[in-house]
Amino acid sequence: MTNIKNTFGNKFIGAHVSAAGGVDQAPLRAREIGANAFALFTKNQRQWVAKPLEEKTISAFKANCKMLGFGAEHILPHDSYLINLGAPEEEKLNKSRAAFIDEMERCNQLGLTLLNFHPGSHLKKVSEQECLATIAESINLAHKAVPNVIAVIENTAGQGTNLGWKFEHLAEIIDQVENKERVGVCLDTCHTFTAGYDLRTKEDCEHTFAEFDRVVGMHYLRAMHLNDSKVEFASKVDRHHSLGKGEIGWSCFEYIAKDPRFDGIPLILETIDPDIWQQEINTLRKFHIEEIANS
């Protein structure tokens, strides 16, 4: 357990693994691919309601995480895709807020401290500003209902009426969240790239992350999704690809693996071929260990 940091350096790299058969299986699957971080769904992501977690499942999950050395700060649960915390219709908004609070409660029961979610969509029925304010209020309500868990906003590709693709959207939400200690950001490299922030070269990465720091603040970065993109720059389309096989290329992922600003947070693959996740993790880790050796 104690040797994980020594073996893997300061980077916590994994993938979004299946929780089929119970959430307690997720840490086992993560370890099979050589991960020291992972993401999961704590319930079926395409259903509104799930039966409560059983005590034996909660205990088994915690025991497996402890046995394999996974800390809560390196586990990134993702909420249901159905939830829209900026929904313009009251009924959908109330349903989304109740479901989000349930997701946060499940994280708390499992001893987890992060909950990753897509911010929301205005559906062309309200202004961007109104939608962003509604999202922030949804986070505030969840914070009041459930302790400990940090709401981690994922930037989006900008498809349709989804908000969160501009760094300014993220900053505007955070600005209206009352408890700043319990809000953060997960940057998805594919989404960032297709939203119009270039990542193809080291210089592009320097510029994009400097812009994120200026607008949002690097101290809010709690996690990353490492994905290449099947579609071209600034296309506003979300299509993930395996690392180095898409439009972004390896330079970006080498940059992240070598930059200490991305130490200590979950770096999660959502790439399209689970058969090569271990290979992708090993390549990222090799870049990181090289940097440590040369520093």
Curated annotation (Swiss-Prot):
Bilayer-spanning residue ranges: none
Binding site for Zn(2+) 2: 154, 188, 225, 270
Necessary cofactors: Zn(2+)
Gene Ontology MF annotations: deoxyribonuclease IV (phage-T4-induced) activity; DNA binding; DNA-(apurinic or apyrimidinic site) endonuclease activity; phosphoric diester hydrolase activity; zinc ion binding
Keyword terms, alphabetized: DNA damage, DNA repair, Endonuclease, Hydrolase, Metal-binding, Nuclease, Zinc
Residues that bind Zn(2+) 1: 78, 118, 154
Gene Ontology biological process terms in this record: base-excision repair
Cofactor note: Binds 3 Zn(2+) ions.
EC number: 3.1.21.2
UniProt entry tagged with the keyword Cell division: no
Catalytically driven reaction(s): Endonucleolytic cleavage to 5'-phosphooligonucleotide end-products
Pfam families the UniProt entry points to: AP_endonuc_2 (PF01261)
Residues the record lists as binding Zn(2+) 3: 191, 238, 240
SUPFAM superfamilies: Xylose isomerase-like (SSF51658)
InterPro entries tied to this protein: AP_endonuc_2, AP_endonuc_F2_Zn_BS, Xyl_isomerase-like_sf, Xyl_isomerase-like_TIM-brl
Entry keyword Hydrolase: yes
Job of this protein: Endonuclease IV plays a role in DNA repair. It cleaves phosphodiester bonds at apurinic or apyrimidinic (AP) sites, generating a 3'-hydroxyl group and a 5'-terminal sugar phosphate.
Family: Belongs to the AP endonuclease 2 family.
This protein's name: Probable endonuclease 4
Origin species: Vibrio campbellii (strain ATCC BAA-1116)
Gene name as annotated: nfo
